[in-house]
């Protein structure tokens, strides 16, 4: 058995390749839909992370090697000398830097040490665990030994560019850092450039220097999808020192393999449950409210029943009154996550009628500066209802003074559910518990999606209770 370097990938040469490939594969659930209309008969194909000729992404090396050691303990294997500097580009002399404005928690210090030991890889910290402070410490550790270092941090959106930049200012990092957005040009003399995905996608080909940076950091790295441009950009950046940070990896195996393949193995993992046990995050209770309807949308064969169900629940007066009653009786700040603009607009109109509540709707057209003002209002007041598009507020938003989060649009996404819960887990002096309200519609798709979310709660070790509300 042999591992050899093949340009930008690694090749596994073995008589047992077919068996190993099969282990690192899953059934292709989309094959049926892709084949529809092309052929009457088809065989269920699989998605593999190792090609038929044994090629795979360098970041998967340790996972594949671990499997081989376990399943083939008596088999000798040979690894080309050129491979180790790629899969483990270790920093030999650096020490973890712990002299920022805020001292590192033990697990943050441990994660930085692992990053320095491996030189690349993924740090998984439960949402609210302090990823930005961890990044700052890691980069200060590298800068202390190389004052000329060039670093690129990729974040999902404009809001996180500003949030990361402001956090670095607050932490008193010593390296020079700058922002790069559609409106802000980067200072190329800086050690560290913080950029959102959008600007990189549009400007990557015109800025060849990006390919030659020393260190790449991808924040919220679970957002790297096989099909998006960021995934391809990460491959084109030559450095082997690539790090990813996230609260959770994709539940979909091929997408998970893609992230690991690009950045490296998971080098540190401390999930939300562990952080809650150790009192780094607040406790959480989930109240699943099963809503039964007097009249239900008609299920018609061949039509878009899912869309019809969404239209039904978003415009249903009984359901919206349930939301209004819960919010009016809750005495602290609430975050209501919606998936569709029209639903958010309707809720904004309804909830704005509640006395003694400040109501905001954060959607795509709301400028980043205004979003920041709303966050500050929430941090300093206790009478705010913030309706937000989940695509905006499910990732990377840091507001400690949230006491209740409502899932008002259902859905079954593993990552979005976990990340959304994380919006309210950060500690706050006025909060001893986060309340999650999960609206579960007793309809065809609503029931299916609710069951998926309950599976997620169980996997995350979060208690939930069930309550029925029936329209009469």
Named regions from a protein language model:
Residues 162, 177-188, 345-346, 357-394:
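Conserved helicase ATPase core of P-loop NTP-dependent helicases/translocases
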Residues 132-134, 141-143, 147-170, 341-342:
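Conserved Walker A/P-loop ATP-binding site and its immediately adjacent core
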Residues 301-339, 345-350:
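Conserved interdomain hinge at the start of the Helicase C-terminal
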Residues 412-432, 436:
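Conserved SF2 helicase motif VI
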Residues 80-124:
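Conserved pre-motif I regulatory segment
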Residues 388, 397-410, 435-438:
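A short beta-strand element within the Helicase C-terminal
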Residues 222-286, 457:
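Post-DEXD/H (motif II) to motif III coupling segment of the RecA-like Helicase ATP-binding lobe
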Residues 118-140:
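Walker A/P-loop
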């Amino acid at each position: 058995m042999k591992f050899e370097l093949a340009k930008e990938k690694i090749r596994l040469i073995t008589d047992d390749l077919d068996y190993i490939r099969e282990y690192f594969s899953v059934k292709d659930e989309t094959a049926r839909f892709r084949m529809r209309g092309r052929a009457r008969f088809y065989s269920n194909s699989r998605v593999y992370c190792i090609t038929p000729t044994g090629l795979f992404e360098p970041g998967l090396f340790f996972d594949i090697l671990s499997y081989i050691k376990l399943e083939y303990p008596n088999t000798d294997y040979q690894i080309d000398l050129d491979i180790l500097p790629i899969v483990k580009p270790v920093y030999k002399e650096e020490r973890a830097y712990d002299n920022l404005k805020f001292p590192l928690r033990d697990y943050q210090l441990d994660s930085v040490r692992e990053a320095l030991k491996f030189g690349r890889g993924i740090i998984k910290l439960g949402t609210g665990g302090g990823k930005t402070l961890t990044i700052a410490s890691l980069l200060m550790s590298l800068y202390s030994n190389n004052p000329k270092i060039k670093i690129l941090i990729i974040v999902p959106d404009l809001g996180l560019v500003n949030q990361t930049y402001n956090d670095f200012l607050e932490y008193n990092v010593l390296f020079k850092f700058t922002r790069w957005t559609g409106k802000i040009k980067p200072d190329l003399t800086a050690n560290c450039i913080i950029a959102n995905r959008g600007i990189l996608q549009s400007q990557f080909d015109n800025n060849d220097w990006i390919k030659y940076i020393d260190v790449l950091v991808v924040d919220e790295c679970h957002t790297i999808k096989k099909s998006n441009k960021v995934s391809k950009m990460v491959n084109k950046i030559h450095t082997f020192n690539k790090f990813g940070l996230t609260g959770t990896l994709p539940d979909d195996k091929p997408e998970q393999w893609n992230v690991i393949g690009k950045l490296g193995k998971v080098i540190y993992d401390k999930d939300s449950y562990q952080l809650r046990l150790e009192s780094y995050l607040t406790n959480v209770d989930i109240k699943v409210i099963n809503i039964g309807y007097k009249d239900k949308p008609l299920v018609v064969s061949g039509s878009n029943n899912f869309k019809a169900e969404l239209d039904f629940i978003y415009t249903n007066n009984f359901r919206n009154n349930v939301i209004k009653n819960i919010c009016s009786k809750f005495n602290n700040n609430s975050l209501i996550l919606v998936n569709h603009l029209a639903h958010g607009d309707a809720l904004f109109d309804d909830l704005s009628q509640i006395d003694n509540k400040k109501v905001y709707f954060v959607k795509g057209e709301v400028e980043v500066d205004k979003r920041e003002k709303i966050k500050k209002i929430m941090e300093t007041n206790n009478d705010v209802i913030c309706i937000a598009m989940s695509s905006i507020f499910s990732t990377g938003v840091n507001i400690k003074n949230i006491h209740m989060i409502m899932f008002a649009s259902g859905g079954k996404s593993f990552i979005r559910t976990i990340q959304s819960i994380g919006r309210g887990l950060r500690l706050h002096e006025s909060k001893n518990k986060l309340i999650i309200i999960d609206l579960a519609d007793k309809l065809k798709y609503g029931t299916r999606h609710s069951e998926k979310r309950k599976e997620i709660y169980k996997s995350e070790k979060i208690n939930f209770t069930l309550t029925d509300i029936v329209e009469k």
